[in-house]
């Protein structure tokens, strides 16, 4: 498969087995759900009726008062009572093996190419950590919400993109699958795409 570099118009040869992979929506969904679940702290905690502090005395006698019967002030029906099915701390993380992760990554990159949302450039850098320089450079390429993937993180790019909510910078070691799916377009350097290809073989 041949990819054309947008800045130099050179041709870059990549593996069709990786960047021409079939679209597997179910696998992508499973991996992204697991990825998102892993970020959950899971430290929610509520008290059941057994854990609420208070007297176990019956509030009033069973019959003769005209009021609804009550056996405890800790009842979930009462204010300040326990919760019926109290949430407890739990681990939400799901196991995703390497084969599934690689399959999802290949499927996402292949679909980005098919949808013409992947922009490959020879290199992507700016001379100074100025937001204006980055905006001017992006205007020549795209005006959409964009994810920029570089081989190594550059300080100038990171500082320039800090206050641009439509731009995210990452290196190939920290590719976020959720960002790959949600951003309108992905800009990636030629060196980065070859590194990704080596990892996914």
Swiss-Prot record:
Residues 45-66 are annotated as: Disordered. The keyword rRNA-binding applies. The keyword Nuclease does not apply. GO terms for molecular function: rRNA binding; structural constituent of ribosome. Pfam families: Ribosomal_L4. GO terms for cellular component: ribonucleoprotein complex; ribosome. Keywords: Ribonucleoprotein, Ribosomal protein, RNA-binding, rRNA-binding. Signal peptide: none annotated. InterPro entries: Ribosomal_uL4, Ribosomal_uL4-like, Ribosomal_uL4_dom_sf. One of its GO terms (biological process) is translation. Belongs to the universal ribosomal protein uL4 family. Part of the 50S ribosomal subunit. One of the primary rRNA binding proteins, this protein initially binds near the 5'-end of the 23S rRNA. It is important during the early stages of 50S assembly. It makes multiple contacts with different domains of the 23S rRNA in the assembled 50S subunit and ribosome. HAMAP family: Ribosomal_uL4_B. This is Large ribosomal subunit protein uL4. It comes from Baumannia cicadellinicola subsp. Homalodisca coagulata. The lineage of its organism: Bacteria, Pseudomonadati, Pseudomonadota, Gammaproteobacteria, Candidatus Palibaumannia. The gene is rplD.
